[in-house]
């Protein structure tokens, strides 16, 4: 069973090309889930896009500037596929000279890194199943929006 959680992020860009090279990173809002740097899979949905892994912290997206991005993020916790609840996305528009983040929110990532060693055990013992608190970004029993 795989719980699918969808987060919308909005990219804005002042660059002239219609398509921008952007890196999306996420901030967790569920203490049972690990920090973004060990979430290897980010899947764009509902849009025409290309995505590839960029280390373990983010994925590179090719989207039209100003376009809404919908993502499903999953990882394997030992033998269990799990998903995280996200409340914040930072869209970084890469240009030839700089990277401009439209929003911030990565301050809590460092604090969560020390939780990673016990994150699977905490998930198994406290949740006991693939169930997560509802948030504004978690769809109902249906598919992604």
From Swiss-Prot:
Glycosylation sites: 98
Disulphide connectivity of cysteines: none
Secreted as UniProt keyword: yes
One term under GO cellular component: extracellular region
Compartment list: Secreted
Keyword Secreted among record annotations: yes
InterPro entries per UniProt: DUF5570
Principal location: secreted
Source organism, top-level taxon: Eukaryota
Keywords: Glycoprotein, Secreted, Signal
Region spans: Disordered: 103-145
Pfam families linked to this entry: DUF5570
Signal peptide as annotated in the record: 1-22
Name of this protein: Uncharacterized protein KCNJ5-AS1
Lineage start: Eukaryota, Metazoa, Chordata, Craniata, Vertebrata
Designated gene of the protein: KCNJ5-AS1
């Amino acid at each position: 069973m795989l719980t699918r959680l969808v987060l919308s992020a909005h990219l804005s860009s002042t660059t002239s090309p219609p398509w921008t090279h952007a890196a999306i990173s996420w901030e967790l809002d569920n203490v049972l889930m690990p920090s973004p740097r060990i979430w290897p899979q980010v899947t764009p949905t509902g849009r025409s896009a290309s995505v590839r892994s960029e280390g373990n912290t983010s994925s590179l997206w090719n989207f039209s500037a100003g376009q809404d991005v919908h993502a499903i993020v999953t990882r394997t916790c030992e033998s269990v596929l799990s998903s995280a609840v996200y409340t914040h996305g930072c869209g970084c528009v890469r240009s030839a000279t700089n990277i401009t983040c439209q929003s911030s929110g990565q301050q809590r990532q460092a604090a969560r890194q020390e939780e990673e060693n016990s994150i699977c055990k905490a998930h198994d013992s406290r949740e006991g199943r693939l169930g997560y608190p509802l948030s504004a970004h978690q769809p109902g029993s249906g598919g992604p929006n």
